[in-house]
Amino acid sequence: MRHRKSGRQLNRNSSHRKAMFSNMASSLVSHEIIKTTLPKAKELRRVIEPLITLAKTDSVANRRLAFARTRDNAVVAKLFTELGPRFAKRPGGYTRIMKCGFRTGDKAPMAYIELVDRPAQEAASAE
């Protein structure tokens, strides 16, 4: 029985999943919008939202926790200098998932996941 087993397996072992979501979270922080499959986007929300909440209060301990999850100093710097202050007044709900059709090769449902309140010039260049 799979009672109380949360999260998607995505046909990967646990270390592959952890590495994949760490990389995807780093990409989302860097580019503020990424295109991926819908199940991965929904699961990425569970990784990125606590990171942004952590970045709202800047401390050495929080920076170390964020680095442990992303393993990238540039991403940690952007989290705490740009994204934390940007979302300081917002109580959660930092990401938006927009469905964008199906992938041509295997008809997998695709989606964009983006950070809300993104600067307008980046939104125009992503299109």
Swiss-Prot record:
Q: Gene symbol?
A: rplQ
Record-level GO cellular component terms? cytosolic large ribosomal subunit
Pfam families in the cross-refs: Ribosomal_L17
On assembly, the entry states:
Part of the 50S ribosomal subunit. Contacts protein L32.
Molecular function (GO) terms for this protein are: structural constituent of ribosome
Q: Which domain of life is it from?
A: Bacteria
Name the family the entry cites.
Belongs to the bacterial ribosomal protein bL17 family.
- Which InterPro entries does the entry link to? Ribosomal_bL17, Ribosomal_bL17_CS, Ribosomal_bL17_sf
For this UniProt record, the keywords arranged alphabetically read as follows: Ribonucleoprotein, Ribosomal protein
Kindly indicate where the leader peptide sits in this chain.
none
GO BP term, pick one: translation
Protein's name in the database: Large ribosomal subunit protein bL17
